[in-house]
């Protein structure tokens, strides 16, 4: 698709926020991308419209039965050039999530073109400070106003944009405290753990709140059958460094196939590190720590990119990783990864997609 997407212009534009106080997900740009689906027409009426409230039926099936999926990616600006980071991977995963919830597939190329035009219109909203970016949230939900469990015949896709501050406030990486959850489970194989569906996040909130009350930042989930194999953290995939080797749980159908995870694996190999994707039990992890072999732990995700783990608690035992300091490999991966994202380091893998001026 190369033709321009229809744009419905606002009469007045918003005042842009102070870029030193952005935080995450607090401010939204002037426009959003909108796309509608019904069983007779398919996807239609792709357009850019003013950001604002939308009207849905009180009986909208997405509200009642949970047909709702989303994605998250970022755009970066440097010296006037705007680039997306691996957006094609997000739209592939979006389609995988849609398929799992019996929702209609989207044309990935068409959607990417629409996103580029939206980001181009909003390029003045993209902050250029250290660690800052434009967060992009595509999401799809069922809108048919009818009760009764079944796949909806109508859907809406929206893409909204939010200028975001540096995750670490422009400071050095800050190790997090992780609580290993051994009562609740996030997902089971054959379920929706591999998909980015809204319900996965709702189901994690109780355990997350309990962990916060105990003084921990996030929850580390174990498998849903034996509750012994490590899967992922609440909003991140998880990595371990043992004797210089980078290890991460293998994808098994209940772990989200993170795009940052995929990129970190490729990057680590390019940098000469040995990488293993395999099952890792929580007992093995603690044994590795006791032997002095576990030297670093970090999470990966769109928001933080890489988040070092300084403290890990399982049952009645708490361990401190690397004296609660960011490890050498963790820091190296973060520096190179973010350098590629923001354009200060060479993009040898072709991950950055430059947004043209239309």
Curated annotation (Swiss-Prot):
SUPFAM superfamilies, alphabetized: D-aminoacid aminotransferase-like PLP-dependent enzymes (SSF56752)
Top-level division of the source organism's lineage: Bacteria
GN (gene name): ilvE
Cofactor: pyridoxal 5'-phosphate
GO BP field: isoleucine biosynthetic process; L-leucine biosynthetic process; L-valine biosynthetic process
UniProt keyword terms in alphabetical order: Amino-acid biosynthesis, Aminotransferase, Branched-chain amino acid biosynthesis, Pyridoxal phosphate, Transferase
Keyword hit for Transferase: yes
Coiled-coil annotated residue ranges, if any: none
This protein's name: Probable branched-chain-amino-acid aminotransferase
EC number annotated for this UniProt entry: 2.6.1.42
């Amino acid at each position: 698709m190369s033709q321009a997407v229809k744009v419905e212009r606002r009469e007045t534009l918003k005042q842009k926020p102070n870029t030193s106080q952005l935080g995450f997900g607090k401010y939204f740009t002037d426009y959003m991308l909108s796309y509608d689906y019904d069983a007779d027409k398919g996807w239609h009426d792709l357009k850019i419209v003013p950001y604002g409230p939308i009207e849905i039926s009180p009986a909208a099936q997405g509200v009642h039965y949970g047909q709702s999926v989303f994605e998250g990616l970022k755009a970066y600006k440097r010296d006037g050039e705007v680039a997306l980071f691996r957006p094609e991977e997000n739209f592939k995963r979006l389609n995988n999530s849609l398929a799992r919830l019996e929702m209609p597939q989207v044309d990935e190329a068409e959607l990417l073109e629409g996103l580029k035009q939206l980001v181009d219109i909003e390029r003045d909203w993209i902050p250029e400070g250290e660690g800052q970016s434009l967060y992009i949230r595509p999401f799809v939900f069922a809108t048919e106003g009818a009760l009764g469990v079944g796949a909806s015949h109508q859907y809406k896709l929206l893409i909204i944009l939010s200028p975001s501050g540096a995750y670490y406030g422009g400071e050095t990486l800050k190790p997090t405290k992780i609580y290993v959850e051994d009562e609740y489970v996030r997902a089971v194989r054959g379920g929706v753990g591999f998909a980015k569906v809204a319900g996965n996040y709702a189901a994690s909130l109780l355990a997350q709140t309990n962990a916060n009350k105990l003084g921990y930042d996030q929850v580390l989930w174990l498998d849903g059958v034996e509750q012994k194999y490590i899967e992922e953290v609440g909003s991140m995939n998880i990595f371990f460094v043992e004797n210089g080797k980078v290890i991460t749980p293998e994808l098994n159908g209940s772990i989200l196939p993170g795009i940052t995870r995929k990129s970190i694996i490729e990057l680590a190999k390019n940098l000469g590190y040995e990488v293993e994707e395999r099952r890792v039990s929580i007992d093995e992890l603690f044994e590795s720590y006791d032997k002095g072999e576990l030297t670093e732990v970090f999470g990966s995700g769109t928001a933080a990119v890489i988040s070092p783990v300084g403290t890990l608690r399982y049952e009645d035992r708490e361990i401190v990783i690397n004296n609660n300091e960011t490890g050498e490999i963790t820091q190296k991966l973060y520096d190179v990864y973010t350098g590629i994202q923001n354009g200060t380091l060479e993009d040898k893998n072709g991950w950055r997609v430059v947004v043209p001026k239309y």
